[in-house]
Amino acid sequence: QEPATLTTATGIIHGTFDLPSGTEPFPVALIIAGSGPTDRDGNSAMLAGKNNSLKLLAQSLATANIASLRFDKRGIGASAAAGPKEADLRFENYVDDAAAWVEQLRHDKRFSTVTIIGHSEGALIGAIATARTHPNAFISVAGVGRPAGFVLREQLNGKLPAQLFQANEKILR
């Protein structure tokens, strides 16, 4: 493992490279976490315990001679200082971050090709970043197969107070 950083206008985003033991250049995968306060290892501050799903994925890729980069989203973990105030955070920030990581990986001579792997919301972020940066490949892991507004309504129904749910509905229209 090796630390990685991405400098943004709001601060530094921190990540981890998992590198194979072999001869460079390696293919590299950018792993993008799903929604919520999810760290580079795939753990959410909203859930008890740790599953380390993204860390395990990165380790498995390394055994297959594929390097990977996973990172704490802005506002989370070691990237907490890079997060704007909650009111100023936009989905596009995450897309911009993913696109910047792809460009950084593309110019790193240790890597031969760049693939984006996005989980859940990370798949949507990855798809948009793919359209912008044209990596060699894109993999969606449990990405939404229905319109995002429909999925958000399902996820938030019964979890928000009625007034807040109605305000959310206006945004989703």
Go through each PLM region and give its residues.
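Conserved alpha/beta-hydrolase
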Residues: 52-80
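Alpha/beta-hydrolase active-site loop
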Residues: 53, 86-107
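Short, surface-exposed "cap/lid" segments of acyl-processing enzymes
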Residues: 22-61
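Alpha/beta-hydrolase fold nucleophile elbow
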Residues: 108-120
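Accessory cap/linker subdomain of secreted extracellular hydrolases
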Residues: 141-173
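Short glycine-enriched nucleophile-adjacent loop
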Residues: 123-133
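Residue in the alpha/beta-hydrolase core beta-strand immediately N-terminal to the catalytic nucleophile
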Residues: 115, 137-139
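N-terminal cap/lid segment of alpha/beta-hydrolase-fold proteins
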Residues: 1-24, 28
